[in-house]
Every structure is written in C-alpha cells, then in structure tokens.
Regions:
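Acidic, divalent-metal-binding catalytic cores of TOPRIM
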Residues: 2-367
C-alpha cells in the first residue's frame, strides 16, 4: 500500500525524483531572424536583475537569454565569469557587479581586467543591490508594499545625509581594500560602523543621523591615530576616486551592496512601512463600516500587502541613476556595433541599412 502511494505521489509531483533532461520542458522555438546572445551572470539572484536591464534593449535582430554559466559543475561568482573573458564575444557576454573595480580604475590587476574587457558589462555601482536601493525609488517601494502613498519620510534627503556622514569611513574602507595585503579597515569593521540599528522618524531621522555621526567620528579618529602615515596618501587616493565620479552625496552607491540593503535601507523601509500600514488600518477602523463589512474591508487590505524585501528585490525604478545611464550607454554601444557587424556580414539580409537604423532608433526610444 505504501509503495503504491509513493508511486502516485511521483506522478502528481515530478520533483519527488530527479528529472532527466529528456523529461524537462523544451524551450520554445527561437525566432530565426534573431541572433541568440547568451548573457552569463554571477548567481541565480542576478538573473532577474539583468533580465530587467536587457528588457530595455529589445530589438528585431538580437535576443538575450540570461543565466548562470552553463557548466556541469554549476560554477558561480565573479571569478568564474572573469575566467570566461577569453571566450566572450558578440554572442556571449558577461555581466558582473563592479565591486571596487570601476572606482579603482587601473590600480589593481582585477580592475584593469574588468574595465578593459570588451564583452563584460559591470554595474558601475558596487553591486546590483545599490541600484535596488537608489534613494528616489524607495518611496515607491513603500507604496507597493503597503498600498499607502502618503509621504511621511523623505528618503532622498535622509540618504543624502547618510551618504555624506559615512563618506570618511568609506574612503578608509576603499583605501584598505585596494592595499589588498593590509587589513587596515576590513569589511566587517566598516559594516558595524555604518549600519543603523533603528530609525527615529521624527525630523526625518535626524536623531538616527546624529547617533551615526558620533559613531563615525569616533571610528575615524581611531583610524587616523592608528595609521598616521596613511593620511596624506589617502588624500591623493580620494582625488582619484572623485575623478571616477565619487562624491560624498553618492558614496552609498559605491559601498558594499548587502551592507547597504540589509543594514540601512531595510531598516528604513521596515520603519516607514510599519507606520504607513498603521495609518491605513486606523483609517479603516475609523470608518463607518461595522461588523462583517469592517472585517471584510480589513481582510481586503491585509491581503493586498506585500513583503517589503520582495518588493525591493523587484524594484526597477533606478533608471534615472547616473551610474545606470553609464551602463545603458555601454550596452547601447555594444548592440549598435553588433547589429552593424551583422549587417556587414550578411546576417541581416532583408532589411536595408536605413531600415536597420530606424529599428535601432525605435529600440532606443522604447527605453
């Protein structure tokens, strides 16, 4: 009896046993007029982000398919993709987090390799999480999570002040990172120094910022006392980073992405969304509805709520970020170059040169 029951379970749930390749769903037939471009990313969590990026670049001649590297040992990570640079081409491109490679320019071997790779695209911001946490987009995250559009907190102003506050420690952390052999200010210390443990909504989080300023000042003073010989070299280092676009106001876009998301932005969002939900519930309970009608109204509202983290991970309202604009231009140049080469090689036969140019222009207008 138990054996028959297990057999029935297998029929209803194919995941009770490993499926063979022959049993897996087959991909839909591709458009023969479009060239398939394989886009490899660092990990599974990056697939959705880069899918959202390349959705802005649809055109009649190329189709992008996003995935982790397709190898039997299922490798993942930036190092794996960097090992694939020699294989990259018009039909195989690589997308990675910049980490510090953009800011460091040619100061390290890895930054030179990333910045000079013809078919590798990087975020310019430290990681994809920094785009998701782009300050002007955070109010919309609250609206989608709570279904309440009331503005009770200025995310842009707070993140401006936060970024300026942590800027001195960011310089120490970045300087320590580019030394590679010296553990002056490692990530674990940077993370503990720039995290916010709470948000006091009064005066747009000013008390929280004051608390952070005190912590940052203490840590900076300690670093200067411990490493007096690094103070002058750091001034030159700062000028070089500013030449790459770093400012006190946008430092949060270049800091460690998971630290920003988990220890700063999620603290803000949880606090703000809690208040917005409470406001909506208070409005419902203060209404004239009673009994079953009130209960149904409350259920309708609570059922419409979404996980704050899930909404943040789905956030795509970062397209006005200047760093995204740089990534956008890189991809546009690659697409224009590839389509032009396809036309010259005869891969695009039916469309005239003017038609190709018009289609490319229309594709850019979609963005």
């Amino acid at each position: 009896m138990a054996k028959k029951f297990r057999e029935k379970l297998r029929k209803f749930n194919p995941f009770t046993r490993p499926m063979t390749l022959d049993e897996l769903p087959k991909p839909l037939p591709a458009n023969p007029d479009q060239r398939l471009v394989r886009v490899y990313v660092e990990g599974y969590e990056d697939v959705a982000f880069w899918r959202g990026i390349f959705d802005h670049f649809q055109n009649p001649y190329m189709r992008f398919e996003i995935s982790v590297p397709n190898r039997a040992d299922l490798p993942k990570g930036k190092k794996v993709l960097m090992g694939m640079i020699p294989r990259s081409s018009d039909e195989l491109i690589l997308c990675v987090d910049s980490d510090f490679d953009f800011l460091f320019a040619d100061r390290t071997e890895q930054s030179r390799e990333v910045n000079n790779a013809r078919y590798m695209f990087h975020t310019y911001a430290y990681a994809t999480e920094n785009f998701l946490c782009y300050a002007p987009s955070l109010h919309n995250v609250c609206v989608k999570a709570t279904k309440n559009d009331t503005r009770i907190f200025d995310f842009v102003r707070f993140m401006h002040e936060y970024s300026c506050t942590i800027y001195p420690l960011f310089l120490w952390y970045a300087y320590s990172a580019q030394l590679s052999s010296e553990n002056v200010f490692p990530l674990i210390d940077f993370k503990s120094a720039v995290r916010i443990g709470y948000l006091d909504l009064a005066d747009n989080g000013e008390k929280t910022l004051e608390w952070l300023r005190r912590n940052v000042a203490k840590r900076e003073e300690m670093l200067r006392k411990r490493n007096p010989k690094m103070i002058e070299p750091m001034k030159e280092f700062e000028e070089q980073l500013r030449g790459r676009g770093l400012t006190p106001e946008n430092a949060y876009l270049f800091m460690h992405g998971h630290t920003l998301m988990d220890n700063v932005v999620m603290i803000l969002l949880n606090s703000v969304c809690e208040k917005l939900r409470a406001m909506s519930i208070a409005k419902i309970t203060a209404s004239k509805k009673q009994g079953v009608a009130l209960k149904n109204e409350m259920a309708n509202y609570t059922n419409s709520l979404r996980s704050i983290r899930d909404v943040l991970l789905d956030n795509e309202n970062y397209t006005k970020c200047p760093l995204y604009k740089r990534l956008q231009r890189d991809i546009e140049k690659y697409i224009a170059r590839t389509i032009w080469n396809m036309k010259r090689s005869g891969a695009i036969r039916d469309d005239s040169t003017w038609t190709v140019l018009r289609n490319m222009r229309q594709g850019s207008e979609i963005k």
